């Protein structure tokens, strides 16, 4: 993935020129979609362009757009989030927070455009890599790159389907303007398409070497395949049992991962691509070859007291959920995920050990009721004061697989099989004792609790609420 990061920005311009393929005259010294795909290097460059839309690059390719599109669309509608003071200055963000938005909302439009751009790039990878002469690419590499294209195409379609009622399935690279006009697909057809793409991607390598870490693997494909089946199980009651079984089967194939003991390190830049990470957006402070894979995300997440812009805050609902089980962790405090996720007024953050960037909470915050996100903030004072950060963003973690598998098992009527999976996450990440209760309803409630406090800012709550019909 390191190589892909550096070449992505170079090749995107070449692939954008494909928009002019409708013209009958081509410049002999300009790459187009018809002349670009010559060998393995070109195919890898095209794949890099497909990955690039994970960063939701718009605003002329500036990485400012990454937090300003992804989190307003995916997080502002969650009940565990509230808008910060500066966010209230942007009407299109406020619309998302108070549910008065329409499809004309600019953040929705950017989100839609960026992911369909990624789908177009992925379609080029799938179609054009297959046309590269055999002498310029070996068969195994060709197959792997095409299957990677299938994964990326499925991911973008799935994110769109999770956020809209209906989407347009784009199953081919468009070369004729007449093909742009296409009706919305049914959710059933969209799920069928996504699932088939993910099935193809399960043949990807199980692991990646250092130069390619962050690229999709078979584990990535199986994890999202299970997620797709689980979500679909709630939408199609007549096939619920079958989809739940398929979800569990997919989750069982997610192998070679473990939960990380130090929860906060996965979101501070200290433990990139950890043993728990299944699919993760890569960032780098390097600007070599014009790369811009760094962000000011820590400014966007951070509160004003910590030099941030005050765009996003935890809601009282989230704070109450963290405190729900009381100070019952083995540490004698609340669930350890609370301290890894939030800065708040408590003995832990005011014990004189400088746990908030070398100082106590009280040294930073005049308002003692103020609660701020720690998650996705740099771990050091030096990092806090840098203009840019390069903290990776996990999109799929093993904890998610365990909790989704527990959910599927419980919905099948096997709460006794779900409970050990829940307790594993509670113990490793929260230092919490085993859950109370053994009934299906108790397990349902516990899964919701665990997901609420496990994934803040990872943007699963809205999809959970939709899946559960809440």
Predicted features along the sequence, with ranges:
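C-terminal motif of bacterial Sec signal peptides marking the signal peptidase cleavage site
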Residues: 16-18
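Alpha-helix C-terminal capping/termination sites
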Residues: 159, 163, 231, 235-240, ...
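Sec-dependent signal peptide recognition
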Residues: 2-9
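C-terminal structured "cap/appendage" subdomains that terminate the fold
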Residues: 421-470
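Conserved, well-structured interaction surfaces
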Residues: 39, 44-48, 52-60, 84-164, ...
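C-terminal substrate/ligand-recognition segments
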Residues: 109, 336-423
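An aromatic- and glycine-enriched ligand-binding surface/loop that stacks and positions planar moieties
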Residues: 20-89, 167, 191, 198-200, ...
């Amino acid at each position: 993935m390191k190589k892909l990061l550096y070449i992505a920005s170079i090749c995107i311009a070449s692939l954008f020129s494909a928009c002019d393929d409708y013209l009958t005259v081509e410049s002999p010294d300009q790459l187009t979609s018809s002349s670009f795909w010559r060998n393995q290097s070109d195919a890898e460059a095209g794949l890099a362009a497909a990955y690039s839309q994970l960063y939701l690059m718009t605003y002329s390719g500036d990485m400012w757009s990454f937090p300003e599109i992804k989190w307003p669309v995916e997080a502002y509608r969650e009940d565990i989030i509230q808008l910060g003071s500066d966010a209230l200055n942007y009407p299109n963000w406020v619309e998302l927070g108070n549910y008065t938005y329409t499809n004309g909302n600019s953040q929705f439009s950017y989100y839609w455009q960026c992911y369909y751009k990624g789908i177009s790039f992925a379609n080029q990878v799938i179609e054009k890599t297959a046309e590269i002469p055999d002498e310029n690419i070996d068969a195994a590499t060709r197959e792997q790159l095409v299957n990677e294209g299938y994964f990326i195409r499925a991911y973008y379609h799935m994110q769109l389907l999770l956020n809209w009622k209906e989407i347009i399935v784009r199953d081919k690279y468009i070369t004729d303007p007449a093909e742009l006009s296409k009706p919305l697909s049914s959710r059933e057809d969209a799920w069928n398409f996504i699932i088939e793409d993910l099935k193809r991607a399960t043949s990807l390598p199980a692991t990646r070497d250092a130069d390619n870490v962050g690229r999709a693997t078979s584990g990535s494909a199986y994890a999202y395949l299970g997620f797709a089946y689980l979500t679909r199980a709630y939408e199609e009651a007549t096939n619920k049992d079958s989809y739940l079984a398929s979800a569990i089967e997919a989750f069982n194939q997610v192998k070679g991962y473990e939960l990380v003991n130090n929860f906060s390190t996965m979101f501070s830049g200290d433990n990139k691509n950890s043993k728990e990470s299944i699919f993760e957006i890569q960032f780098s402070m390097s600007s070599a070859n014009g790369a811009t894979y760094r962000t000011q995300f820590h400014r966007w997440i951070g509160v004003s007291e910590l030099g941030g812009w005050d765009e996003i805050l935890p809601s009282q609902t989230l704070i109450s959920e963290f405190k729900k089980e009381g100070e019952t962790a083995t540490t004698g405090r609340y669930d350890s995920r609370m301290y890894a996720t939030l800065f708040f007024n408590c003995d832990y953050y005011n014990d004189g050990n400088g746990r908030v960037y070398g100082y106590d909470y009280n040294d930073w915050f005049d308002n003692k009721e103020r609660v701020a996100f720690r998650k996705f903030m740099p771990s050091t004072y030096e990092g806090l004061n840098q203009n840019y950060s390069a903290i990776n963003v996990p999109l799929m973690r093993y904890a998610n697989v365990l909790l989704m598998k527990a959910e599927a098992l419980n919905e099948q009527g096997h709460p006794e099989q779900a409970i050990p999976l829940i307790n594993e996450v509670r113990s490793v990440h929260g230092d919490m004792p085993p859950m109370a209760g053994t009934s299906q309803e108790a397990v349902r409630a516990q899964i919701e609790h665990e997901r609420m406090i496990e994934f803040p800012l990872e943007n699963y709550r809205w999809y959970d609420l939709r899946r559960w019909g809440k």
